[in-house]
C-alpha cells in the first residue's frame, strides 16, 4: 500500500485552507480547498475519488493508499478545534497573542518555534493520557 503525505495548511493572509497530496504510483496530484481544515480535507478526498474514477475509465489500476496528514500550525488548531490556544501557549511559555496569530494564519512561526509548539502539544497529550478519572 502506498503511503501518501497530505499537507493541510492556510497561507498567510488567506481565508481558506488547502489540502494537497501527490500519488506517485498513478502520477496524480489532488488539491482540496475549504473554509476549515476539515472542509479542505473533504474536498481533497472527493477530488481523489473523482480522480480514481477517471483513471479506472482510462483502464488504469488504482491501488489503495494510506494517507498521512501533516498540518501547519494554523491548520492544526483549526482541525483539532478542541485544543485551546491559550492553554497551549501557557504550557509552552509563548504569548497567547502570538499563538493566536499563528493559529489564524496571520504569522508563521520559525522552525524552532514550531518545534517548541509541537513539543508542547505532545507534552499536553502525555499529561492527558496519564490522567486518571474516577
Feature-to-residue mapping (PLM):
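DNA-binding alpha-helical recognition surfaces that contact promoter or target DNA
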Residues: 42, 101, 119
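Short loop/beta submotifs within extracellular cysteine-rich repeat domains
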Residues: 125-126
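Short glycine/proline-enriched turn or capping motifs at secondary-structure junctions
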Residues: 13-17, 110-111, 115
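Short, basic, alpha-helical segments at the C-terminal edge of helix-turn-helix-like DNA-binding modules
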Residues: 116-122
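Short, charged, surface-exposed hinge/linker loops at domain edges
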Residues: 5, 46-97, 101-103, 107-114, ...
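DNA-contacting interfaces and partner/effector-binding or oligomerization modules
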Residues: 1-59, 64
Amino acid at each position: 500500500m502506498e503511503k501518501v503525505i497530505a499537507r493541510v495548511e492556510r497561507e498567510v493572509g488567506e481565508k481558506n485552507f488547502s489540502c494537497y497530496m501527490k500519488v506517485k504510483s498513478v502520477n496524480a496530484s489532488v488539491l482540496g480547498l475549504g473554509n476549515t481544515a476539515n472542509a479542505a480535507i473533504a474536498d481533497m478526498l472527493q477530488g481523489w475519488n473523482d480522480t480514481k474514477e477517471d483513471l479506472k475509465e482510462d483502464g488504469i489500476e488504482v491501488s489503495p493508499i494510506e494517507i498521512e496528514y501533516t498540518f501547519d500550525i494554523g491548520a492544526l488548531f483549526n482541525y483539532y478545534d478542541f485544543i485551546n490556544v491559550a492553554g497551549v501557549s501557557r504550557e509552552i511559555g509563548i504569548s497567547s497573542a502570538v499563538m493566536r496569530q499563528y493559529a489564524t494564519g496571520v504569522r508563521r512561526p520559525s522552525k524552532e518555534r514550531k518545534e517548541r509548539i509541537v513539543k508542547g502539544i505532545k507534552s499536553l497529550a502525555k499529561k492527558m493520557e496519564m490522567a486518571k478519572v474516577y
